[in-house]
Amino acid sequence: MSSNCTSTTAVAVAPLSASKTKTKKKHFVCQKVKLFRASEPILSVLMWGVNHTINELSNVPVPVMLMPDDFKAYSKIKVDNHLFNKENLPSRFKFKEYCPMVFRNLRERFGIDDQDYQNSVTRSAPINSDSQGRCGTRFLTTYDRRFVIKTVSSEDVAEMHNILKKYHQFIVECHGNTLLPQFLGMYRLTVDGVETYMVVTRNVFSHRLTVHRKYDLKGSTVAREASDKEKAKDLPTFKDNDFLNEGQKLRVGEESKKNFLEKLKRDVEFLAQLKIMDYSLLVGIHDVDRAEQEETEVEDRAEEEECENDGVGGGLLCSYGTPPDSPGNLLSFPRFFGPGEFDPSVDVYAMKSHESAPKKEVYFMAIIDILTPYDAKKKAAHAAKTVKHGAGAEISTVNPEQYSKRFNEFMSNILT
């Protein structure tokens, strides 16, 4: 089962030292007739399928309340001898959306307009991420970096069905104010007889603010260091021991710490009730001063390049990059933010460092990987690790109640 795969379900804007395109002009070709052009057939089918299902849903009235059958429902379409747009789409494919009414309701509760969601997934091809789970889990972001698309296993799909009703009820009760993953859609794509399952969530990290350092924290210290291979990446995912050895702290202030831990405790208690464990707190850190310095350097280079190309007359325009065309209502009216500023309705997991902190930072924090039930396989792994490391060791495969308690305690200690 895929439950042994730990992975990062957020994709950051890479540090500018690695990718110097933040303020360069980006050109996204947006045709009136969508061509769903992507680098591989599976992504073209995803774009086509989401476009199709959202269009179909727009003709279905929003019910007063969801019914039990909505949590078992699906819509599927089989396309044969597809001649239109054959240079981009395979001639035969199948697309299935799970629980369409439920996920539409969840998108609404998370403040995501269906038109915005459709545009983000279909306007330009999703982007591959270098984040990858140990079992080959694949991550992509939508072109505007608002949503993460993750491949999952059929077991994960089954587990989603198991928890979806209670998850939805929890989201209703907390009014969408949660650190849990925001599940927005779940699909099965069949191309050349191969089935691929995908789940779409809101990106934990910002589409705009660069993440300079990130951590996957479980509250366990056994075998919880980033590998040398991981550390060689432009933006490695560090782990618990790396965090502790660096003496890292998240300096948010007393009030923000109290509010965050209350929300975390409520979310984690819910996961323990569902017998779910092995989740992580994903943490991204945006260094405001470093970002300003990188921005200035890139703007200077861009200005020099553009002024060389355009002549002296273009000088005033050279200082400003052009953001990509943006989906529907969320970004119809551009808003200009100062350094380290963000829109809390978009960057819902963001939190500023306290005014007294030695460095001005923005933290992005959310719970990820919640589709791991405490089943027989986990119990066996726990027994094996206990034999190897001893009963007192902080291993990650404890039971859900122990896991949640240890998780809360660890997170309480790293916030200040």
Curated annotation (Swiss-Prot):
Identify the enzyme class: transferase
Residues holding GTP: 203-204, 214, 369
Q: Which residues carry this modification: N-acetylserine?
A: 2
Post-translation: what modifications? Ubiquitinated by the SPOP/CUL3 complex. Ubiquitination is stimulated by PtdIns5P levels.
- Which residue ranges does the record assign to the PIPK domain? 38-415
Task: Provide the positions where the record notes the PTM Phosphothreonine.
Answer: 8, 322
Q: Please state the protein's primary subcellular location.
A: endoplasmic reticulum
The domain of life for this entry's organism is Eukaryota
Q: Does the keyword Transport apply?
A: no
In-chain residues carrying the UniProt-annotated modification N6-acetyllysine? 94, 150
Look up the EC number in the record and give it.
Answer: 2.7.1.149
Question: What name is this protein filed under?
Answer: Phosphatidylinositol 5-phosphate 4-kinase type-2 beta
Q: From which organism does this entry originate?
A: Rattus norvegicus
Report the gene name: Pip4k2b
